[in-house]
């Protein structure tokens, strides 16, 4: 058995992870080869080369973007994907119940099982977690321009941009039916979440051969707390502003070209966006004792609490900033009046 490690920028120290990997990897099962990515798209090329060489597994050290680059070269091959998550969201790893701690993730590489999962395509670009149009795609574009990474940066961009983003009207064609929606966003889930346990498609599974589509209709500021709460509570599909359905293929028609996202990465596409599911296309190393499409209750509870705290802190900070601006403006106006 052979293993290739891909390395790319992320939120944790890769050198430390590589040290742990050298210490903990089962040398009797794996011959270790470490290759550093040098540019965007480099992982696609090298993973394809390793798949042609019939490597047993290619291990992604990074987040969903890195995983996407590697996995797209491994679909419909005998080479499995392994994940040591250290990105800003880690949506696919979380869905697969791969531990966020690198040492424990390495244990999964040594002792895990190989499962076969679905993946999706958006205008023939592969995705493994989620894709979509609308606000989440717009935020992914802003996030890609940010100097800082991580969940707080994403949350900050989400809160700031939500104040000025305007919903669009979309025509949806799915499995023979056509619908028209005015929507804030349309998300297509192969997996259940964006990352950081933000469940945009809470009922999605990786092996049912279906896309889980979530439509968020226009909402008011009064809806934000409940939407945020339910996003992390895995119940957003119960909100009255949400429409959901399942399909194998979906065409999204919009009035003009714009940004889409796939696994959190933005890309410009035209008026027509075609999304489809590809059944059982990728082999993945998963925990041996993982329950199908459930997660550790205590871990989910802690992640949920952390998510709510981040949202609350961000709202408080945003409100405090706005109040300060109003107060400063009031002081300036008062000074002008007193000088008259």
Where does each model-flagged region fall?
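A generic structural signal for short beta-strands and their flanking turns/coil linkers
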Residues: 166-168, 182-184, 207-212, 246-250
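ATP/NTP phosphate-donor binding region
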Residues: 2, 6-57, 291, 298, ...
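Catalytic core of DAGKc-family lipid kinases
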Residues: 28, 76-80, 86-188
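Short glycine/serine/threonine-rich phosphate/pyrophosphate-binding segments
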Residues: 43, 65-70, 91
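ATP/nucleoside-binding phosphotransfer catalytic cores, i.e., glycine-rich phosphate-binding loops
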Residues: 14, 174, 205, 215-340
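Glycine-rich beta-strand-to-loop/alpha-helix junction loops that act as flexible
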Residues: 7, 61-63, 84-86
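Active-site loop ensemble at the mouth of alpha/beta enzyme cores that anchors a bound cofactor
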Residues: 200-208
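Glycine-rich phosphate/pyrophosphate-binding beta-alpha loops
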Residues: 132, 187-200, 266
């Amino acid at each position: 058995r052979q293993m290739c490690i891909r390395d790319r920028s992320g939120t944790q120290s890769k050198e430390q992870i590589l040290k742990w990997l050298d210490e903990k990897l089962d040398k009797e099962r794996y011959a270790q080869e470490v290759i550093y990515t040098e540019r965007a798209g480099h992982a696609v090329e090298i993973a394809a080369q390793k798949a042609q060489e019939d490597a047993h597994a290619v291990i992604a050290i990074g987040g969903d973007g890195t995983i996407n680059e590697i996995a797209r070269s491994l679909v419909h091959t005998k080479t499995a994907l392994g994940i040591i998550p250290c990105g800003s969201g880690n949506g696919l790893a979380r869905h697969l119940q791969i531990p966020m701690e690198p040492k424990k993730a390495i244990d999964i590489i040594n002792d895990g099982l190989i499962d076969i999962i679905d993946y999706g395509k958006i205008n023939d670009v592969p995705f493994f977690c989620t894709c979509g149009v609308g606000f989440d795609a717009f935020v992914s574009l802003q996030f890609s321009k940010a100097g800082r990474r991580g969940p707080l940066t994403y949350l900050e961009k989400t809160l700031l941009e939500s104040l000025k983003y305007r919903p669009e009207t979309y025509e949806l064609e799915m499995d023979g039916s056509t619908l028209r929606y005015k929507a804030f966003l349309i998300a297509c889930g192969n997996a259940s979440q964006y990352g950081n346990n933000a469940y945009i498609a809470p009922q999605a599974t990786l092996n049912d051969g279906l896309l889980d589509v979530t439509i968020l209709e226009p909402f008011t500021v009064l809806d934000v707390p409940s939407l945020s709460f339910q996003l992390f509570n895995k119940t957003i599909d119960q909100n009255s502003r949400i429409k959901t359905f399942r399909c194998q293929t979906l065409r999204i028609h919009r009035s003009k070209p714009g940004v889409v996202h796939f696994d959190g990465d933005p890309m410009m596409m035209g008026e027509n966006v075609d999304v489809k599911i590809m059944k059982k296309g990728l082999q993945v190393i998963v925990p041996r004792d993982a329950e199908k499409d459930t997660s550790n209750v205590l871990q989910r509870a802690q992640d949920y609490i952390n998510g709510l705290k981040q949202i609350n802190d961000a709202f408080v900070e945003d409100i405090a900033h706005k109040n300060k601006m109003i107060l400063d403006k009031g002081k300036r106006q008062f000074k002008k009046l007193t000088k008259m």
